[in-house]
Amino acid sequence: MFIIIFIVLISLIGCETLQHDGKVFPMKGPLTRVVIYNDNDYLLGVHCKSRDDDHGFHILQKGGLYGWMFYVNFMNSTLYFCGFSQEQVKKGVFDIYKAVRDSSRCRNCTWEAKEDGIYGYGEIPKKNPLFYKWLM
């Protein structure tokens, strides 16, 4: 009986495996979009990465946007973090997408860099969306 259940589970996992750009992704989760918006009067440096992907360094003008899309992994452990800077001054490194926190909060996750820190917005309105304060 155990062998039959094991074979059925392996078959289901095999059916859920998807091919994309030459890579195999088993049972991927929902497509998620992250956007960072600079609402400051200065240039904002942004460098985002995950364990597997490095999105490189970007400079956002006032009103500038930077974003990307990804699939949340089926283990719900997807994590992206971003470092922020103003000129040569580090403003902080923060978890911009953390599946255990954000998968139920947003599929379109918008982050707004303001004078005092990073504000997070999703489909469900939050009373105080200030997630992270800048380092002083």
UniProtKB/Swiss-Prot annotation:
Glycans are attached at N76, N108. Keywords: Glycoprotein, Secreted, Self-incompatibility, Signal. Residues 1-17 form the signal peptide. GO terms for cellular component: extracellular region. The keyword Cell wall biogenesis/degradation does not apply. Belongs to the plant self-incompatibility (S1) protein family. PANTHER family: PTHR31232, S-PROTEIN HOMOLOG 24-RELATED. This is S-protein homolog 6. Pfam families: Self-incomp_S1. It is found in: Secreted. GO terms for biological process: rejection of self pollen. It comes from the Eukaryota. The keyword Glycoprotein applies. The lineage of its organism: Eukaryota, Viridiplantae, Streptophyta, Embryophyta, Tracheophyta.
